[in-house]
Amino acid sequence: MLTITAIKAFNDNYIWVLQQTPHSQVYVVDPGDAKVVIAYLVSHQLALAGILLTHHHQDHTGGVGELKRYVEQTSSQTLQVYGPQKENIAHVNVPLNPEMRTELTLPFLNAQIQVLNVPGHTAGHIAYVIEDALFCGDTLFSAGCGRLFEGTAEQMLSSLTLLAKLPANTRVFCAHEYTLSNLKFALTVEPNNLNLQAYMQKATEMRAQNSATIPSSIALERAINPFLRVGEQSIIDSIKQHFDDPDPIKLDELTCFTRLRQWKDIF
C-alpha cells in the first residue's frame, strides 16, 4: 500500500514522502529544505531511495544537494534524483523528458509512474501520477494555479486542461497551502457557486484546526477552481464585468484564462 505523508517546510510548502509498505525506503517530492526531511527520515527510521522534482525553483530543490550528501555518508550509495530535462537542475542524474518517456518504474514503489509535461509556471515543469495521486508542484493548486514565470498562458491552459482530464477521484498533491487565499479570489470571480461557498466554509474550519487542505481532488477542482472553469458562462460574465468589456461576443477560453490570471496576479 502506498502511503503519502506531508512534511511542512518554510511558510506554506509541502514536501511529499512516498512509501510503499512494508519497505522502509522512501521517495520525496520537491524537497526545498533538507533538514526537515532528514529529521523525518531519522525519527521514522527510513532510508531515502530517491527524489522526484517537478521544477527548478529553489523552494522545491534547495535541499537536494544536502540530501544527496546525507545518503552518500549514511549508505555509500548515490541518490537517484529525477527531474525535468529541460530545466538543467543541479544534482539531477535521471533527467526526464515526458515528450520521449512518459512512464517510470522506481525501486520500492510497486506502481507505474506517469510523467506529464505541464509547462506554464516554468518552461519545463513536469508532474507525476502514481496510482490515484497527482504530484503537480506549482502548476495546479487547490482553487488556483501557478503564476506564469516562464511559460505562456496558452501553455498553462493546456497543462491545466490535461490535468483536469485525469480521473475524478485523482488526489491532487500540490506543493503549497494556498487554498484559503485562492478561494477568496475564486468567490470574487464566481460568488454564486454553491460548491465554492461550501468548500470555503470547510477549508476555513480545517485551517483553523491547523489541518491541511491538501490533497484536493480533480473532482473538487473541476467544481471550484476558476482556472479549470474558464468555459463556464458565470466565469466569462465575471471577467467581462471586471475588465469593463461590453462586447456581447463570447470570449474564447484562452482569452478568459489570460485575463483571469492577470486579475489574480494583482488580487
Curated annotation (Swiss-Prot):
Pfam families listed in its UniProt record: HAGH_C (PF16123), Lactamase_B (PF00753)
Catalytic activity: an S-(2-hydroxyacyl)glutathione + H2O = a 2-hydroxy carboxylate + glutathione + H(+)
SUPFAM superfamilies: Metallo-hydrolase/oxidoreductase
Cofactor binding description: Binds 2 Zn(2+) ions per subunit.
SMART domains the record matches: Lactamase_B (SM00849)
An example molecular function term from Gene Ontology annotations: hydroxyacylglutathione hydrolase activity
Pathway stated in the Swiss-Prot or TrEMBL entry: Secondary metabolite metabolism; methylglyoxal degradation; (R)-lactate from methylglyoxal: step 2/2
Keyword Electron transport on entry: no
Domain of life of the organism encoding this protein: Bacteria
Tagged with keyword Zinc-finger: no
Keywords: Hydrolase, Metal-binding, Zinc
Binding site for Zn(2+) 1: H55, H57, H121, D138
Binding site for Zn(2+) 2: D59, H60, D138, H176
Record-listed E.C. numbers: 3.1.2.6
Family (UniProt): Belongs to the metallo-beta-lactamase superfamily. Glyoxalase II family.
Subunit structure, interactors included: Monomer.
Function: Thiolesterase that catalyzes the hydrolysis of S-D-lactoyl-glutathione to form glutathione and D-lactic acid.
Name assigned to this protein: Hydroxyacylglutathione hydrolase
Organism of provenance: Shewanella sp. (strain W3-18-1)
Gene (name only): gloB
